[in-house]
Amino acid sequence: MAHLSDLDIANQSELKPIGEIAEKAGIPADALEQYGHYKAKIDINQIKPKDNKGKVVLVTAMSPTPAGEGKSTVTVGLSDAFNELKKNVMVALREPALGPTFGIKGGATGGGYAQVLPMEDINLHFNGDFHAITTANNALSAFIDNHIHQGNELGIDVRRVEWKRVLDMNDRALRHVNVGLGGPTNGVPREDGFNITVASEVMAILCLARNINDLKEKISRITIGYTRDRKPVTVADLKVEGALAMILKDAIKPNLVQTIEGTPALVHGGPFANIAHGCNSILATETARDLADIVVTEAGFGSDLGAEKFIDIKAREAGFEPSAVVLVATVRALKMHGGVAKDDLKEENVEAVKAGIVNLERHVNNIRKFGVEPVIALNAFIHDTDAETEAVKAWAKENNVRIALTEVWEKGGKGGVELANQVLEVIEQPNDFKFLYDLDQSLEEKIETIVKDIYGGSSVTFSKKAKKQLKEFTDNGWGQYPICMAKTQYSFSDDATALGAPTDFDITIRELEAKTGAGFIVALTGAIMTMPGLPKKPAALNMDVTEDGHAVGLF
């Protein structure tokens, strides 16, 4: 039987006017800034904070296959399932990046009958947030180069400008560039480079800011580079934090859309979890908590990346904790971690499923280290067999792990009711929530804690450059910041081919980046890139637009 594509399902769905969705969510009319019929921004100053805020349900996953395991789909479907159960719920998601949409994964608004809409708009330009973030980032680059050109009063060392330009595109050719060429009138020549917009510190700041003043304060703390005597230079030194915050004055407002089943959805911010902190904005999550009793949100990739950063960076900054954690698993990912080649994942292989459970088991144990009991959402795919599914359920029962077969892709909210009921039971129980590390530990200790306790590694090797940076950053007063690991999403290690649950491995930290505006230190491992490239056959090859302006090929 042929299944409709995600885009076909989205196009056949009947959207409600965004005013109706806002009314359902309890958003007052004067807080709604409409972008057409089905999208809006929310003026958070018009939302009345409530004392008894909604509970946060975090959705994370096991180590994924390149195609992803349907974490966004489960997040959306779970919110619709709570809606089925007549719960006051909102879903809070990240915005998709445009670059990867044309790369491997295609769109990122859920799938099947568990999607946020309007899917085309959200996956392409949405309400312009990423463009504003890109503009603010690159305006800062222009201000830096202009300052150097106009006499360099601050004494910025052109060899030590840390700030890079960004673009919301996968474009490997821009990783390393030279700027200021062509003679004295074109500026001072120096090496530069581009990151993808989702790796920009401006993106991280937007997602961690509590209000416009906090946004401005965080922007002012950005370290753009160093003087010739190695003193940090900040945006405050350039006196442009006001201008940059002004560019972001609308982007900071959360975006309101809806699921196929009419559940209110806040989609705002979009840092990657392998090269950034991987969570939607604090503002969107907190706004949802002021409006709903349950807020379902997600953090990128596996629990070793997104969930760890959600807890140790976002939740710590925002001052809340997850009341439940959903761990998305799939039969195909289990088979991959059990040794099955990518091209054979559709074939039944119960033994490989059992062998791959070691990966899922480590993710379960990792969530428990934060004092929260996980619920496994076994996300159903059409090629799964009963024997494979039962093997996972049997393991979960034997090891006292909550599990629910989740069929939201095919059935929408009704396919997630079992999962929702299990999550409700966890929410009602007390937990022993705790962070993985204390901020007063050294940067080195915090990195080692993540590697040993979450990844299962035995040691950390710091490159000569990273060792030097550890001392410099600590001397600069940045030792109290949390850590944001930049690591492959496919393995617990820094080797993407080491699947399953590797042990006794060493992780190499090749360099550190001080994100003093966002308030964390990025530790770069392996060959991780902050500007991705496109695959040999990008998803763009299957995309088109019809004569009447409808997108084709957005999955």
Curated annotation (Swiss-Prot):
Keyword Hydrolase: no
Keyword S-adenosyl-L-methionine on entry: no
InterPro entries: Formate_THF_ligase, Formate_THF_ligase_CS, P-loop_NTPase
Residues that, per the record, bind ATP: 65-72
Recorded catalytic activity of this chain's protein: (6S)-5,6,7,8-tetrahydrofolate + formate + ATP = (6R)-10-formyltetrahydrofolate + ADP + phosphate
EC number of this enzyme: 6.3.4.3
Single GO MF annotation: ATP binding
Pathway listed: One-carbon metabolism; tetrahydrofolate interconversion
GO biological-process terms attached to the record: tetrahydrofolate interconversion
PROSITE patterns: FTHFS_1, FTHFS_2
Top enzyme class: ligase
Keywords, comma-separated and alphabetical: ATP-binding, Ligase, Nucleotide-binding, One-carbon metabolism
Family to which this protein belongs: Belongs to the formate--tetrahydrofolate ligase family.
Protein name, per record: Formate--tetrahydrofolate ligase
